[in-house]
């Protein structure tokens, strides 16, 4: 069975209440339940992890090296600031898809730079909550083609 890790960064635990005009009304728990169901239907084990702390995200990536085949990451604000998360992802050699609910390239200038994009196998941005399912489809397709 393929094992995929979903990582959500800072403030994504506030989905459903935080700026619903940008991020929608679904909670992170709703998203995780829906995505886990889709993954299970495809015989994939999806592990979900959220942290507001950069070091915890780095630790999770490092701990996953032997058990996870692919990562989906919505690093939130860490997308634009975290070299340590970038280094952990690169060092892990686990293929990853960067995802964002909003289109980060159509927002404030500081959100247009990502420390992850050039190392990701792909990026999904701007499709609302559907960005999660699109990213899952993308990583499954990528990993399946590598078998």
Swiss-Prot record:
Active-site residue numbers: 23 (proton acceptor), 100 (proton donor)
**CDD domains reported for this sequence:** DHQase_II
Enzyme Commission code(s) on record: 4.2.1.10
Site: Transition state stabilizer. Where?
Answer: 18
Residues that hold substrate according to the record: 74, 80, 87, 101-102, 111
Amino-acid biosynthesis: is it a keyword of this entry?
yes
Q: In which pathway does it act?
A: Metabolic intermediate biosynthesis; chorismate biosynthesis; chorismate from D-erythrose 4-phosphate and phosphoenolpyruvate: step 3/7
Sorted alphabetically, which InterPro entries does this protein's record hold? DHquinase_II (IPR001874), DHquinase_II_CS (IPR018509), DHquinase_II_sf (IPR036441)
Q: Does Transmembrane appear among the keywords?
A: no
GO MF entry, a single one: 3-dehydroquinate dehydratase activity
Protein role: Catalyzes a trans-dehydration via an enolate intermediate.
UniProt-listed PANTHER family: CATABOLIC 3-DEHYDROQUINASE
The entry's protein name is 3-dehydroquinate dehydratase
